[in-house]
């Protein structure tokens, strides 16, 4: 809970981490915005979800016309938003008030703050303490590639990722507390933003139903109804738009229609996997390194929390920690499945700084990290230099990329 009782007097006090962590995050975003001019108040040119919400309010599924600068699916001569639809559901009440000019950046910023709060709650649920929570949570949000998407969270690609990130943390928190219905409902919301998180169904199932009997499953099965309704909405919407309940629209993007391999192919895997190890090149002006801004680069530079996760997992594995149980297998297995799906995609995120497709994995990496660590004070020594690396590279890289300095 966010409130604790004073040791004397029985009064309530606010757990300070719920204030300090969002404040630190906002300060960093303010600094980045002050160098780039990308404030939350600026107009959003990539407002695909707002346009879709307005179309729904007008009683139509397609957008009515082409917007050449947006990634639209073209099917039977009509133009559709090609991304999974859940963010448009969130924007419906805002579109009813503001039309297509919804406050997208503010909405995504709000989701980031909610995500920070749930990351703290998840840490408390797993470790049983708030001690060191601020270090792990700020490592997750500021020391990795999330910073790049958070600065322009209203853009269509980043709004979906911001919401998916938060819904993933919410799903993990409720699964850790055995609220299986809410856990799968939030995972269904995350799936409606970034479908690749379907890989984590086994993890949420294991975490949320640990030690549950078949009789308990039968008695509480109704709790899965909200998740089933959300998935049912996706299936019906897809069928109504593309005559295929499993098609969100990306297959009908011109770039994938023209591709002989399509959107997903095993033929992409080797090339994309190798890009996860791509280092900055030498030979820049005045001795500077040359950082790539298309697809991705070395994951340990952009998302060093993964390095901490891997080291801590190996530590837990060699110690044969019974307390970790199936987490030693299911967490890395589901992350590897997610990674394989990502590598089989035609692109690795296009123009960006870092590895934005890998960002979707980080809530689950965070869960694994705090699950494996051998008590407070045992694993934290590695996080400080890794946080320094990730924070400095991502902050400078984010500012440089948005300013087109690199």
PLM regions and their residue ranges:
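Membrane-proximal envelope and lipid/glycan-remodeling enzymes
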Residues: 1-406
């Amino acid at each position: 809970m966010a409130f604790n009782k004073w040791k004397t007097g029985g009064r309530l006090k606010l757990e300070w981490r719920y204030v300090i962590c969002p404040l630190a995050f906002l300060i960093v975003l303010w600094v980045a915005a002050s160098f780039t001019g990308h404030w939350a108040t600026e107009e959003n040119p990539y407002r695909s979800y707002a346009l879709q919400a307005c179309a729904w309010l007008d009683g139509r599924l397609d957008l009515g016309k082409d917007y050449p600068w947006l990634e639209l699916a073209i099917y039977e001569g009509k133009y559709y938003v090609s991304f999974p639809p859940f963010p448009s559901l969130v924007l419906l009440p805002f579109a009813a008030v503001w039309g297509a000019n919804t406050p997208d950046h503010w909405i995504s910023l709000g989701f980031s703050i909610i995500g920070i709060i749930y990351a703290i709650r998840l840490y408390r649920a797993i470790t049983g303490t708030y001690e060191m929570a601020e270090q792990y949570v700020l490592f997750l949000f500021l020391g990795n590639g999330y910073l790049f998407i958070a600065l322009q969270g209203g853009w269509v690609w980043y709004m979906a990722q911001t919401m998916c990130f938060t819904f993933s943390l919410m799903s993990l928190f409720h699964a850790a507390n055995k609220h299986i219905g809410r856990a799968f409902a939030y995972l269904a919301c995350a799936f409606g933003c970034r479908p690749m998180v379907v890989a984590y169904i086994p993890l949420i199932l294991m975490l949320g139903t640990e030690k549950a009997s078949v009789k308990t499953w039968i008695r509480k099965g109704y709790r899965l109804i909200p998740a089933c309704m959300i998935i049912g909405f996706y299936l019906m919407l897809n069928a109504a738009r593309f005559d295929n309940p499993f098609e969100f629209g990306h297959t009908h993007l011109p770039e994938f229609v023209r591709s002989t391999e399509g959107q997903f192919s095993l033929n992409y895997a080797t090339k994309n996997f190798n890009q996860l190890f791509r280092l900055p090149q030498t030979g820049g002006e005045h001795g500077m390194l040359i950082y790539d801004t298309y697809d991705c680069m070395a994951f340990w530079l952009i998302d060093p929390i993964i390095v901490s996760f891997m080291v801590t997992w190996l530590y837990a594995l060699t110690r044969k920690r019974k307390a970790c149980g199936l987490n030693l297998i299911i967490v890395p297995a589901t992350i590897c499945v997610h990674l394989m799906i990502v590598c089989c995609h035609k692109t690795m995120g296009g123009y960006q700084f870092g590895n934005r497709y890998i960002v979707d994995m980080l809530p689950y990496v965070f869960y694994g990290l705090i699950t494996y660590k051998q008590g407070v004070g045992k694993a934290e020594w590695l996080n400080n230099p890794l946080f320094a690396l990730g924070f400095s590279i991502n902050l400078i890289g984010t500012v440089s990329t948005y300013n087109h300095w690199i």
